[in-house]
Amino acid sequence: KGSVSVDLGASYHLSMGILDEMASWTIGFQAANLGSKLDGQKLPARLGLGGAIDLPFSMDNRLQVALDFNYLLPSEYRHLQAGIGAEYNFLKYGIIRGGYHFGDNDKGTGNYGTLGCGINFWPIRADFSYALADKDCFMHKTWQLGIGIVF
């Protein structure tokens, strides 16, 4: 038996001049996992709303701050999640970032912080991140390493 699921989203982006540089902000909405059951199980649909602001201090240094909210459905998964994070890109090459996820321990999503760093050496990008979570959180002792090509 087949199944179909769709995700829908939209975003709005606006640039503006601040401190002789072009700052920008973005706001977006997403509805995900909308569709029929998969192997007899309903997918946990998600409604999301988020925004970010990008503040350049110079051509080589910028700060990005983001905030998002997600509401999960159906009833057995129903709860609100939120996240906030910041990333500072310095000298065009180095990146440091941090964030915090607000979840629901009873639903298995938990609260945890994240720290990360990265390097951009065009066309290569490398990132490392680590989750700061309690022992009973699913993100406990989680780290990620990513290497990519920018084009």
What are these regions (language model features)?
Residues 26-28, 39-151:
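Outer membrane beta-barrel transmembrane domains
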Residues 1-39, 43:
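Loop-centered beta-sheet repeat module
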